[in-house]
UniProtKB/Swiss-Prot annotation:
Molecular-function GO terms, alphabetical: clathrin binding; phosphatidylinositol-4,5-bisphosphate binding; phospholipid binding
Name of the gene this protein is made from: epnA
Recorded domain comment: The ENTH domain coordinates with the clathrin-binding C-terminal domain to allow a dynamic interaction of epsin with coated pits.
Span list, region Disordered: 177-417, 463-571
Pfam family, one: ENTH
Bias-annotated ranges (Low complexity): 269-340, 383-417, 527-547
Role description: Binds to membranes enriched in phosphatidylinositol 4,5-bisphosphate (PtdIns(4,5)P2).
Biased composition (Polar residues): 185-211, 237-256, 491-503, 558-567
Localization (cell): Membrane, Clathrin-coated pit
UniProt cross-references to InterPro entries, sorted A to Z: ENTH, ENTH_VHS
Name this polypeptide is given: Epsin
């Protein structure tokens, strides 16, 4: 009762899991029941091992059973029995797979399990040793497999005629095992009931049951089948006239079809095929004559073949009109009445009518070089140029060309020399193209509203023109043109405006300029003329009529706000000029040679140019505020130290109290300035 319940549970589980049938058979053969696997189960499994689909399922279940724990020792033992049977009777691939798992089998040699005070593991250990010994001996495996085939042949003759080539009952089956070694078993494995379905009924339609009997008897080495009258009749049926005639008709049909295809494509080898057809037909007729057929039938067949050959030849003549000339005709269209193939002239005319693709192989017209400067002023950099050379492009834009075809459009060509004034602010151009400068904005007091001049280019050191304005013309570090500025007075200009030189015109007076209401001190009168005259109140009439104080100057070099000169590339012997107001004496030589205004980042490096002084916004910021903030502020502030607040140099401590100048820009010249206080006092008392 318990066994039935377990069997029902197994069936229900297999139905739910859709377990293959061969897997259920292997599980049943290696179950935990107290009885071993039956011969029928092992036989079915051995036959299924030849099937490539069933083989992995069989071996998978076996290796899973072998690795079960000790309480399922029956699974292990029955798996070893099944392996031993499959090595002897199953597929040769079982042997290779078992050798791959030799280590798993060797572990069973030490298998131990005690059940009900009995060492049930002993049977497992002994069986594992036997399987290992069998797998390691190839000669023994071959002998065992031959012996198994011999034992199977003993059961073949029993009920052989009654089963009519059927693998029925519990016997080992029909005569499949009687054939070659290793190969017959494989046919039997795929055979069984399947071979009956393919060989029994279907083969009977061609040769009948007698054919199978003859084949089986020939395999068994018996000649009884050939001695029977029925077998003789059946043998005649294999080579009988109807079969040979049918085959001849089939060959004739195939030859006619081949000839028809050759005729359609104009092959010249039709005669050879026809001759072969005659040869085949003659052979077929000879066979029919040997098989005791009437000569009339053979003659009729020959006549039919000749008729067929004549038809083939006629077909060749009809379908191959160019065969005599050796040419080949093209196959006709499917309709049979289509138009003739297009001639080469017609095809060429069609090709000429078809639109051609664009030919990119032609060389494109050369584009003019174009320079794009992103730093140029957009308001003035977009110059309207009338370029007549653009018409050479035939009003067609070349591929990749960025220059407009129209003559009146704005271009980005900044190298046009036709215009009088270019608004360039290029930091990369190191050569000056137009040395003549036009002063069109003479009355413009706003420094930032001035349009940049053509020659104001950063980094240009090759200016050879003798310009009188060092700040509007000379570039950064360009002191070669400072010799011709003898008539230039920086304090004659308004705040930040150095573009207007002495051009002979009277400059309008700006009431908002704080420097227009007062006069600067004049250092040119120090130690000269009237010692009692204050340099602040000293008035000199300029050529333009404006009252301005003339600062001290030297013959060579531009005048600075401090009264000294900016030395040119050639050092000036300023120390030997005499005792001119104390500023040029040997005691104050630190101003020139000590690096105060030149080397110590004074007017040129620190004040005017680098610190955005007079040229770039220094003096434009609120009158002398630029001097204090950007220019002379590094010197400690001349406004705060002495000149402005002290009211000039009337007081005795004028130059002595210029601590800002000594401590700021002339930091290391404190001793020099202080040391010269006496000379300043003696020379500058007025």
């Amino acid at each position: 009762m318990e066994t039935m319940i377990k069997s029902y549970i197994k069936k229900g589980k297999d139905a739910v899991l859709n377990t293959p049938e061969i897997e259920r058979k292997v599980r049943d053969a290696t179950s935990n029941d107290k009885w071993g696997p039956s011969g029928t189960q092992m036989q079915e499994i051995s036959r299924a091992s030849y099937n490539y689909e069933c083989f992995p399922i069989i071996m998978g279940v076996i290796w899973k059973r072998i690795n079960d724990p000790g309480k399922f020792w029956r699974h292990v033992y029955k798996s070893l029995l099944l392996i031993d049977y499959l090595v002897r009777n199953g597929s040769p691939q079982v042997i290779r797979d078992c050798r791959h798992h030799t280590m798993e089998i060797k572990t069973l040699v030490e298998f131990q399990y005690i059940e009900e005070e009995k060492d049930v593991g002993l049977s497992v250990r002994e069986r594992a040793k036997q399987v290992i010994d069998l797998l390691q001996d190839d000669q023994r495996i071959k002998e065992e497999r031959d012996k198994a085939k011999t034992n199977q042949n003993k059961y073949v003759g029993i009920g052989n005629d009654s089963r009519d080539f059927g693998y029925g009952g519990g016997s080992y089956g029909g005569g499949g095992y009687d054939s070659d070694s290793y190969g017959s078993n494989q046919r039997d494995s795929y055979g069984g009931n399947q071979r009956d379905s393919y060989g029994g009924n279907q083969r009977d339609s061609y040769g009948g049951n007698q054919r199978e009997t003859t084949r089986r008897d020939s395999f068994n080495g018996r000649d009884e089948g050939y001695g029977n009258n029925n077998n003789n009749n059946n043998n005649n049926s294999y080579d009988s006239d109807p079969y040979s005639n049918t085959r001849a008709e089939y060959e004739n049909y195939s030859n006619r079809a081949e000839t028809r295809r050759n005729n359609e494509f104009g092959d010249d080898s039709n005669n050879s095929y026809n001759n072969n057809n005659n040869f085949n037909n003659n052979n077929n007729n000879n066979n029919s004559y040997n098989n005791s057929n009437n000569s009339n039938n053979s003659n009729n067949n020959n006549n039919n073949n000749n008729y067929n050959n004549s038809n083939n030849n006629s077909n060749n003549i009809q379908n191959n009109p160019n065969a005599a000339s050796g040419g080949r005709s093209r196959p006709r269209a499917a309709s049979g009445s289509g138009p003739s193939p297009a001639t080469p002239n017609f095809q060429s005319s069609q090709q000429q009518q078809q639109p051609t693709l664009i030919d990119f192989s032609e060389p494109t017209p050369a584009n003019k070089p174009m320079v794009f400067d992103p730093l140029a002023d957009l308001a003035s950099g977009m110059n309207n140029t009338n370029n007549n050379n653009n018409n050479n492009n035939n009003n067609s834009n070349s591929f990749g060309g960025f220059q407009s075809v129209n003559n009146n459009q704005n271009s980005f060509n900044f190298n046009n020399n036709n215009q009088q004034q270019q608004q360039q602010n290029n930091f990369l151009q190191l050569t000056q193209s137009n040395p003549q400068q036009s002063n069109n904005n003479n009355n413009n007091n706003n420094f930032f509203n001035q349009q940049p001049q053509q020659a104001q280019q950063f980094g240009q050191f090759q200016n050879s023109s003798m310009n009188k304005d060092p700040f509007a013309k000379d570039e950064f570090g360009d002191f070669a043109g400072a010799n011709g500025n003898a008539d230039f007075n920086p304090f004659d200009q308004q705040s930040g405006d150095f573009s207007n030189k002495n051009d002979g015109q009277q400059k309008p007076k700006d009431t908002n300029d704080p420097w227009s209401k007062k006069d600067l001190f004049d250092l040119s009168n120090l130690g000269n003329q009237n010692p009692n005259q204050s340099p602040v109140n000293n008035t000199n009439n300029n050529n333009n009529g404006n009252t301005r104080s003339q600062p001290a100057r030297v013959a060579n070099g531009p005048i600075t706000s401090a009264g000294s000169t900016i030395p040119t590339m050639r050092p000036q012997p300023m120390m030997n000029q005499g005792f001119n107001g104390g500023m040029m004496n040997q005691g104050m030589g630190g101003f020139n040679q000590g690096g105060g205004m030149n080397n110590m980042n004074g007017m040129n490096q620190g004040g005017m140019n680098n610190m955005n002084g007079m040229n770039q916004g220094g003096m434009n910021q609120g009158g002398m505020g630029g001097f204090n903030q950007g220019g002379m502020n590094n010197m400690g502030g001349m406004n705060q130290g002495g000149m402005n607040n002290m009211g000039g140099m009337n007081n005795m401590g004028g130059m002595n109290s210029m601590n800002g100048m000594n401590q700021g820009g002339m930091g290391f010249n404190q001793s020099g300035a202080n040391r010269n206080t006496n000379s300043m006092g003696s020379a500058g008392r007025f």
